[in-house]
């Protein structure tokens, strides 16, 4: 649950000076914070599953340093082989799923954005907060998360039904808001509540990988 407190005077001043409804802005903002929290809880649970003993095999670490004289243009495409390795690890573990998404930290996203096959998501007009879908790579949804360890990434399979699920999010109360309460000192209060269930069903549909030495110069013999 979240609780917002504000003065009626501030609400009136904002409307008179700028024609902006403070209440509408508040509901949109705190509703976004609730969604952000739900997303982060789910992603953290998926990451924990991907690093567990029940997950598919860990992907071989990719050393991002080019060999002496090797152009970065060629070096960066090596990461595609790691993604195929991760997808095969999931298929080998489960015999039924391949990687359909990549959840990555900022350094991993930095590399992905430079790949020719990356297709950025269009139409993003809102200021990003927390994890966000940045596009697709070879048909896999790419999620960049500033709260994830910058050099780590998780690959996973999103199935078409519960029978193929690795993780389930079940909203019970999507978003509930209380009526606005105004006290005698002209202070207003409004509460927000959301409730959901989260469950890892099959950790084998996830695997973890990492990169190292991004921007670390050339490899030495």
Predicted regions and their residues:
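Sequence/fold signature of self-assembling virion shell proteins
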Residues: 1-17, 22-28, 73, 77-79, ...
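Basic side chains
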Residues: 3-5, 35, 65
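Short, glycine/acidic-rich hinge or "gate" loops at secondary-structure transitions
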Residues: 22, 39-63
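Structural signal for hydrophobic packing residues in well-ordered secondary-structure cores
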Residues: 31-38, 42, 194
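Secondary-structure transition/capping motifs at alpha-helix termini
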Residues: 36-41, 90-97, 221
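Gly/Pro-rich turn-and-neighbor structural signature
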Residues: 57-85, 89
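Beta-edge loop/turn motif
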Residues: 100-105
């Amino acid at each position: 649950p979240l609780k917002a407190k504000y003065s009626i005077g501030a609400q009136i001043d904002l409307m008179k000076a700028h024609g902006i409804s403070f209440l509408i802005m508040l509901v949109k903002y705190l509703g976004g914070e609730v969604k952000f929290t739900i997303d982060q809880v789910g992603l953290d649970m998926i990451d924990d599953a991907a690093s567990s003993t029940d997950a598919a095999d860990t992907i071989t670490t990719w050393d991002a340093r080019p060999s002496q004289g090797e152009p970065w243009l060629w070096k960066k495409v090596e990461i595609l082989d790691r993604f195929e390795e991760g997808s095969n690890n999931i298929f080998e573990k489960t015999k039924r799923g391949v990687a359909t998404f990549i959840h990555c930290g900022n350094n991993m996203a930095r590399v992905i954005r430079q790949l020719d096959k990356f297709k950025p998501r269009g139409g993003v007009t809102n200021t990003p907060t927390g994890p966000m879908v940045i596009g697709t790579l070879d048909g896999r949804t790419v999620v960049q998360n500033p709260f994830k360890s910058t050099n780590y990434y998780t690959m996973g399979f999103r199935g078409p039904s519960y029978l193929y699920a690795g993780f389930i999010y079940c909203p019970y109360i999507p978003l509930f808001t209380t009526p606005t309460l105004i006290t005698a000192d002209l202070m207003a209060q409004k509460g927000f509540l959301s409730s959901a269930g989260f469950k890892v069903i099959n950790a084998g549909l996830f695997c973890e990988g990492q990169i190292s030495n991004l921007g670390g110069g050339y490899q030495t013999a």
